[in-house]
């Protein structure tokens, strides 16, 4: 079983800039996956090359997306292998 390590949110987000991330929203089973382009002091997020996922199903590309901080449930980094395996499970 893996151990979960607590991290400070701002340094965690700043370290993810330029990397692929997944952002789960508080409602609707919505998740956005894309490259974290920027984050501000309020932790609002700007994603590039974004895809919308609802209830685990890819709904297609959206391009550039801005997500207001109070809508975010969690943010996680994703790697290429993890994303490819999830897409293969979809097919």
Curated annotation (Swiss-Prot):
This is Small nuclear ribonucleoprotein F. It comes from Dictyostelium discoideum. PANTHER family: SMALL NUCLEAR RIBONUCLEOPROTEIN F (PTHR11021:SF0), SMALL NUCLEAR RIBONUCLEOPROTEIN F SNRNP-F (PTHR11021). Plays a role in pre-mRNA splicing as a core component of the spliceosomal U1, U2, U4 and U5 small nuclear ribonucleoproteins (snRNPs), the building blocks of the spliceosome. Component of both the pre-catalytic spliceosome B complex and activated spliceosome C complexes. Is also a component of the minor U12 spliceosome. Residues 8-81 form the Sm domain. Belongs to the snRNP Sm proteins family. SmF/LSm6 subfamily. The gene is snrpf. PROSITE patterns: SM (PS52002). It is found in: Cytoplasm, Cytosol; Nucleus. GO terms for biological process: mRNA splicing, via spliceosome. InterPro entries: Lsm6/sSmF (IPR016487), LSM_dom_sf (IPR010920), Sm (IPR047575), Sm_dom_euk/arc (IPR001163), Sm_F (IPR034100). Pfam families: LSM. The keyword Methyltransferase does not apply. GO terms for molecular function: RNA binding. Keywords: Cytoplasm, mRNA processing, mRNA splicing, Nucleus, Ribonucleoprotein, RNA-binding, Spliceosome. SMART domains: Sm. Core component of the spliceosomal U1, U2, U4 and U5 small nuclear ribonucleoproteins (snRNPs), the building blocks of the spliceosome. Most spliceosomal snRNPs contain a common set of Sm proteins, SNRPB, SNRPD1, SNRPD2, SNRPD3, SNRPE, SNRPF and SNRPG that assemble in a heptameric protein ring on the Sm site of the small nuclear RNA to form the core snRNP. Component of the U1 snRNP. Component of the U4/U6-U5 tri-snRNP complex. Component of the U7 snRNP complex. Component of the U11/U12 snRNPs that are part of the U12-type spliceosome. The keyword Cytoplasm applies. The lineage of its organism: Eukaryota, Amoebozoa, Evosea, Eumycetozoa, Dictyostelia. CDD domains: Sm_F. GO terms for cellular component: catalytic step 2 spliceosome; cytosol; nucleus; pICln-Sm protein complex; U1 snRNP; U2-type catalytic step 2 spliceosome; U2-type precatalytic spliceosome; U4 snRNP.
């Amino acid at each position: 079983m893996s151990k979960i390590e607590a991290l400070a949110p701002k340094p965690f987000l700043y370290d993810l800039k330029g990397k692929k991330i997944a952002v789960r929203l508080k409602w609707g089973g919505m998740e956005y996956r894309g490259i974290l382009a920027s984050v501000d002091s309020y932790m609002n997020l700007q994603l590039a090359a974004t895809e919308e996922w609802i209830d685990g199903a890819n709904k297609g590309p959206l391009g550039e997306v801005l997500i207001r901080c109070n809508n975010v449930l969690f943010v996680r980094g994703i790697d290429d292998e993890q994303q490819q395996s999830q897409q293969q499970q979809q097919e």
